[in-house]
Amino acid sequence: MPSIRATHWCFTLNFSGSIPEINWTADVQYSIWQHERVGHDHLQGYIQMNKHVTLKKMKELLPGAHLEMAKAPKKAIEYCQKKESAIAGPWEYGTWISSGSHKRKLMERFEDGPEEMKLEDPGLYRRCLSRVQMKKIRESCTWNFDLRPWQDELLKTIEQEPDDRTIIWVYGPHGGEGKSAFAKYLTLKEGWWYTAGGKATDMLYSYSLDPTCHVCIDIPRCTREEYINYSVIEQIKNRVIINTKYEPCTIRDDGHNVHVIVFCNFLPDVTRISEDRIKIINC
């Protein structure tokens, strides 16, 4: 099981006697905490780190504290300021960065010094570069071809509201029908996610970064039929996404149906997925 890693954390630090002094390191972006008493004295707090860190690192930062990932940072901050059990505080350290402003700050860093970011944090550099390239392509890309009958049928299908069951399977056995080109074109639109398949853990982790998107799964011709991840297809369609990579979590999004489209050179294996879920569109 991968180590738990997160940016946002909640902590409870029990103590007796004088209030413990906390010395934050430069890795801490922001923290808020207060002295509370509910049967015993403790510090209740929230921490925002500059980057994802492991639970082990957090325990080194706050020895003896009980730590959990904060899934709702704003609510965690409010919880650390509740008056009912407060004795002293709250105290604050640093400046809290909301998720939107954090992205803007990162993009400003990238624009001001891309080569410096490339050396300091290659992973962050690649993510920022990807965001810039996607924005440019979205602004310039148009579909300059006549729609084939199957493409017209697909567009009419996805113009309808998605239901909680139907998986659209675009089938073209010969190649050259325009499946991959159309999948990439569709996913240039906001609210769509593209993948060429792969390991289930990688696919679910990538999708969990923006789990409200409609999905195009563009299966390469070289993929063997037995390697199709039907479990991933059904998890996304069922709106229960179980991500076990880096930050294990289960994402429930009941009631928010999305279109799931599979572009493939072979028909679905109905021994591995319910036949009545599949809508075939022939190229």
From Swiss-Prot:
One of its GO terms (cellular component) is host cell nucleus. This is Para-Rep C7. The keyword Nucleotidyltransferase applies. Its cofactor is Mg(2+); Mn(2+). Divalent metal cations, possibly Mg(2+) or Mn(2+). It comes from Faba bean necrotic yellows C7 alphasatellite. The active site is at Y79 (for dna cleavage activity). A divalent metal cation binds at E36, H42, E84. A motif (RCR-3) lies at residues 79-82. A motif (RCR-2) lies at residues 42-44.
